[in-house]
Design a protein with these regions (language model features):
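Glycine-rich cofactor phosphate-binding loops and adjacent beta1-alpha1 units
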Residues: 162-163, 206-286
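Glycine-rich beta-strand-centered segment in the early N-terminal region that forms part
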Residues: 21-36, 45-96, 114, 135-137
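Cysteine-cluster motifs in flexible loop/terminal segments that predominantly coordinate metals
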Residues: 38, 85-130, 138
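Rossmann-fold dehydrogenase core element
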Residues: 262-264, 275-314
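Residues located in well-ordered beta-strands
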Residues: 2, 14-17, 31, 62-64, ...
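Mid-domain Rossmann-like dinucleotide-binding core that forms the NAD(H)/NADP(H) cofactor-binding site
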Residues: 127, 136-222, 226
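C-terminal hydrophobic helical "lid"/dimerization subdomain
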Residues: 251, 295-344
């Protein structure tokens, strides 16, 4: 089969012919229709994440089951599927209370520890596949169906983690990126009172407004905290969702939080930032980390799209062979929303 392979961290992605995968016990193989080019893939390619190379990256798949191994139940040929890319045990105390991202027996990630979806076929543990719901036309919209499992499920979890309510003003840092634009969408879906997009790339603001932003703030001006306070009449924001998590964004967000404000970080590669306990006490601030989503939240996100309540923003779709060129555009922050590789 054709596959895009990362030979070593930081190296260009290359198109290769590799053997078709064969399912073993408890495994299934899916034909890949499309795979999103998400932030995790971007960091892995750049060498910012540990990846056992050579490796086929990618996890935001739309696929069709073509083979199952012994002992597999619940999947059959022809099923439309996506992937839950955290490989969890399903048995520890965290998995049993539907907090799989904290699994005590975590086995790694699809597209990092095992080969992912930048290929014509993907083999996974059967438990890592999630069936696509009726009402979601995954054959017609494979790119959009594939990115739901991360680009929408991750923001859905944030709304719960941060307890976003209709009275809240929400600011999204890195709002023009693949997770950011969908966070704007989901914040609007939960009826946040005001949604503010913060990004360095003003060219992305039109898409941010389309996704649900009421206000846009150009972070390149270097006065984000001040602008957020101005936008809220000095009261401050209720929730800051930070997909950048650099010291500058974290500190600007904390400075702009109002009473009872919640800061949520999802940027795993940010630096050390300063938070003042006295201010946290005075304003009763909360610092929160939110990591991916649970399987239940992925299923819910798929259903939301199937019902037409949300729709993924995939702005670039390119053939598998153009993976490296696409990631070069991602390197330069030239992609708004999500991009996807079209495989078959």
């Amino acid at each position: 089969m054709k596959a895009i392979v990362l030979r070593e961290p930081g190296a260009p992605l290359v198109l290769e012919e590799i053997p078709d995968p064969q399912p073993g016990p408890g495994e299934a193989v899916a034909k890949v229709l499309a795979c999103g080019a998400g932030l995790t893939v971007h960091h892995a390619r750049a060498g910012r994440l540990n990846v056992a190379t050579p490796r086929v990256l990618g996890h935001e798949i739309t696929g069709e089951i073509v083979a199952t191994g012994p002992d597999v139940t619940g999947l059959r040929r022809g099923d439309g599927v996506t992937a839950y890319f955290y490989m969890t045990c399903g048995e520890c105390r965290w998995c049993r209370i539907d907090r799989e991202t904290l699994c005590e027996n975590f086995r790694g990630y699809v597209g990092r520890e095992i080969d992912g979806g930048y290929a014509e076929y993907i083999k996974l543990p059967a438990s890592s596949f999630i069936k696509l719901p009726d009402g979601l036309d995954w054959r017609k919209h494979p790119a959009e169906a594939g990115v739901i499992c991360d680009a929408i499920a991750t923001p859905v979890k944030v709304t719960r983690k941060a307890r976003i309510a209709p009275t809240d003003t929400v600011a999204v840092f890195g709002a023009g990126g693949g997770l950011g634009v969908h966070m704007l969408q989901v914040a609007r879906w939960v009826h946040a009172r005001k949604v503010i997009a913060v990004d360095l790339a003003a060219a992305k603001f039109e898409a941010c407004v389309k996704a649900g932003a009421d206000i846009t703030i150009d972070a390149s001006e270097g006065r984000v905290g001040e602008q957020l306070l101005e936008a809220t009449g000095g009261k401050g924001i209720d929730v800051a969702v930070d997909f950048v998590s650099a010291p500058s964004t974290a500190e600007a967000a904390l400075a702009a939080l109002g009473k009872g404000g919640r800061y949520v970080t999802l940027g795993g590669h940010g630096g050390t930032f300063t938070a003042y306990p006295g201010e946290m006490l005075r304003r009763e601030l909360e610092l929160l980390g939110s990591r991916y989503a649970t399987k239940e939240e992925v299923v819910e996100s798929l259903e939301l799209v199937a019902r037409g309540e949300l729709w993924p923003m995939v702005t670039e779709k390119v053939p598998l062979e153009q993976a490296e060129a696409l990631h070069q555009r991602l390197d330069k922050a030239l992609v708004t929303g999500r991009a996807a590789l079209m495989v078959t």
